[in-house]
Design a protein with these regions (language model features):
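Catalytic core of pol beta-like nucleotidyltransferases
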Residues: 1-28, 37-42, 52-112
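Short beta-strand->loop micro-motif that forms the acidic, two-metal-ion catalytic signature
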Residues: 47-50
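Glycine-rich beta-strand-to-loop/alpha-helix junction loops that act as flexible
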Residues: 32-34
Length: 112
């Protein structure tokens, strides 16, 4: 297993644990962007989408409150910068967002 694959596995395991502790049931965790395409640089951040039914009917502020501290814990454990995005399953399945479409087309599902 490559170093990148090990890191993705670690990210998945860490996020699963952090989300469970927050009472969030993730349906899917997707890495997209440069890490998914294999063109990351040393200073690249890791782009991640977390999809959960628990984000349905929640504003961006409510989602931030639910997920507070997850990014900080992930950075502490992995030692890389992250960009975490949180979407409901309805948004993931029905959105025409460029970010969601990019993640669906070129991302890598690491959980779910």
């Amino acid at each position: 297993m490559s170093e990148t694959e090990v890191m993705k596995s670690n990210i998945s395991n860490i996020l699963e644990g952090l989300l469970q502790r927050k009472g969030i049931d993730a349906q899917k965790i997707v890495i997209f962007g440069s890490y998914a395409r294999g063109v990351q640089r040393e200073d690249s951040d890791i782009d991640i989408i977390i999809v959960s039914r628990d984000f349905r009917d929640k504003s961006i502020f409510e989602r931030a409150e639910l997920t507070i501290g997850i990014g900080r814990e992930l950075v502490k454990k992995i030692k890389k910068p992250f960009d975490l995005l949180f979407y409901s399953d309805d948004e993931w399945n029905g959105s025409r967002s460029l970010i969601i479409n990019e993640a669906k087309e070129n991302g890598e599902v690491i959980f779910g």
